[in-house]
Amino acid sequence: MSDSISVIREKLNQVTSEHDPFFRKCMQDERKGVEKLLETTRRKWEKEAQLRNKLEEMKQYETDLFQQGYKYIAGVDEVGRGPLAGPVVAAAVILPADFSVVGINDSKQLSEAKRDALFETIKKEAIAIGVGIIEHDVIDQVNIYEATKLAMREALDQLTPEPDFVLIDAMPLRYTEAELSLIKGDTKSISIAAASIIAKVTRDRLMQMYDEKYPGYDFANNMGYGTKKHLLGLDTIGICPIHRISFAPVKEAKLHFDSLK
């Protein structure tokens, strides 16, 4: 074969099967560079196949429900139960039956760049999206568990059309009789995974904004979780207006600084 390695690389990017005549022709090329390209191409196909299989697995709950006659299936998830500062955010997402974007998974398992890209894709292709945001002061009043349920209900209430079935990550909500709570649902249901991405990106962007407003806690990186830098900020600066007073490290910092007044 007279093609250069770079030309072969470009052509292989268009090939989708080992049965392709060009791929079979490359298999006769004894150059080490070509052999490496073929191996890289095979690995790429294998990864793509795994992603497609994962997509089909994650659509199984929705597929079964569509076959039962349900039309608008909402997935619900939350982010921000554990942080010491900021709101808890929930999202509810209704996806079309033919939604087939590969790569969607539990938002915590995705890179920030991948989450951001999928966030835009979901916003564009979803039938409906709702986002519930419950602030720190309400969390302190009702506790984080109840605040999380409030956020989920708020997200569901925003959906138009209304869902006729709800899939929820872990937490039983009793929003409707047609409801199923799934342990680790964000790794089992495409709708819940989509909701987890919407919720996380929304909350992360809020915390990045708060980092500019309340510097010294590293909110842009820790998103309000109790990291070393965050705890150092509490020790040296004290609390800020978005801290959750009912959470032990924040309560201790407040008591300490109040005692110095």
Swiss-Prot record:
Enzyme Commission no: 3.1.26.4
EC class: hydrolase
Entry GO MF terms: manganese ion binding; RNA binding; RNA-DNA hybrid ribonuclease activity
GO CC entries: cytoplasm; ribonuclease H2 complex
Xref: SUPFAM superfamilies: Ribonuclease H-like
Matching InterPro entries: RNase_HII, RNase_HII/HIII, RNase_HII/HIII_dom, RNaseH-like_sf, RNaseH_sf
Cofactor note: Manganese or magnesium. Binds 1 divalent metal ion per monomer in the absence of substrate. May bind a second metal ion after substrate binding.
PANTHER family: RIBONUCLEASE H2 SUBUNIT A, RIBONUCLEASE HII
Function of the protein: Endonuclease that specifically degrades the RNA of RNA-DNA hybrids.
Protein name stated in the entry: Ribonuclease HII
Lineage: Bacteria, Bacillati, Bacillota, Bacilli, Bacillales
